[in-house]
């Protein structure tokens, strides 16, 4: 099971605690939707900001979160590739 969370109201004037919760759900701006795994933690976060979001239970699983390389490693790999390209030419 998965939860579809959608930000339906503006979070202007919300406390910093609520803003952190909204960011924790992966919502960045008005109208954003996320498909999240149905866990007690996610349900608790959604309940905390229930006046700003809508919840919908969806059959199937939520997609696995994508992992990103830390910026330092990605930058190093690009620099190595650039140097190799310069040495080749």
Swiss-Prot record:
Any Pfam family: Ribosomal_L30
Superkingdom field: Bacteria
This protein's GO CC annotations: cytosolic large ribosomal subunit
Single annotated GO MF: structural constituent of ribosome
One GO BP: translation
Annotated signal sequence range: none
InterPro entries (alphabetical): Ribo_uL30_ferredoxin-like_sf, Ribosomal_uL30_bac-type, Ribosomal_uL30_ferredoxin-like
This protein's record includes keyword Ribosomal protein: yes
The keyword Ribosomal protein is assigned to this record: yes
Keyword field: Ribonucleoprotein, Ribosomal protein
PANTHER family for the chain: LARGE RIBOSOMAL SUBUNIT PROTEIN UL30M, MITOCHONDRIAL RIBOSOMAL PROTEIN L30
Subunit record text: Part of the 50S ribosomal subunit.
Family, similarity comment: Belongs to the universal ribosomal protein uL30 family.
Name of the protein this chain belongs to: Large ribosomal subunit protein uL30
Organism per entry: Myxococcus xanthus (strain DK1622)
